A protein has these predicted regions:
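Short aromatic/hydrophobic "clamp" motif used to bind/position activated sugar donors
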Residues: 85
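Acidic donor-diphosphate engagement hotspot in glycosyltransferases and nucleotidyltransferases
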Residues: 17, 46-47, 73, 94-99, ...
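Conserved donor NDP-sugar-binding/catalytic core segment of glycosyltransferases
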Residues: 97-128
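N-proximal low-complexity "stem/linker" segments adjacent to membrane-targeting elements
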Residues: 1-26
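Glycine-rich, basic loop-to-helix element that forms the pyrophosphate-binding segment
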Residues: 63-80
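The conserved acidic donor/metal-binding loop of glycosyltransferases
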Residues: 89-93, 117
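Acidic donor-binding segment of Leloir-type glycosyltransferases
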Residues: 22-62
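Conserved nucleotide-sugar donor-binding catalytic segment
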Residues: 7, 78, 136-168
């Protein structure tokens, strides 16, 4: 499987956490990725220089005004080239084989979208909560949506059917 995955990272404030998020996307075992960081903080002008990670797969977009995370994601989707869109918040990290395993699952099961389990750590790295992906039907998903956006991969063509997939 060599389909391009576009990783959309909206950013507002913490450069240190953003660098870690970018590196967790760049260090995936699945290498055919583009990472699009949408800088939603107009007071930070040269985010690429602050991040200081040189990689041809990394692209920065600067919002002229604060749009919020949702509209920043839409902007990233619109500038993406991948068949798949993956979301990664600027304070989240992925395990190294996250994209590979999830894409293989999607291919095997003919899915257009999927999400995974995840856990939450506190500032000292202790796991404080675990969220497990469950097989859910549409009704149960609507009633109790506990999907971490940073676990989602979806085909771009599905997202493009929605005019603005992320409201603010």
């Amino acid at each position: 499987m060599k389909n391009l995955v576009s990783v959309i990272i909206p950013f507002y404030s913490n450069i240190t956490l953003l660098k870690k998020s970018i590196l967790s996307a760049l260090n995936q075992t699945y290498k055919n990725v583009e990472i699009i960081v949408v800088n939603d903080n107009p007071s930070i002008k040269k985010i690429d220089e602050l991040v200081n990670i040189k990689n041809k797969r990394l692209k920065f977009i600067n919002n002229k005004v604060n749009l919020g995370a949702g509209l920043s994601r839409n902007k990233g989707i619109n500038s993406s080239k991948g068949k798949y869109i993956a979301f990664l918040d600027s304070d989240d990290l992925w395990k190294k084989n996250k994209l590979y395993l999830q894409l293989m699952f999607m291919k095997k099961n003919r899915c257009v979208a999927s999400h995974t389990s995840y856990y939450i750590k506190n500032s000292v790295g202790k796991i404080i909560s675990k969220r497990y992906a469950k097989n859910q039907n549409y009704q149960s998903l609507i009633k109790s949506c506990d999907i971490g956006l940073s676990t989602v991969i979806i085909e771009k063509k599905v997202l493009k059917k929605l005019k603005y997939p992320f409201p603010n």
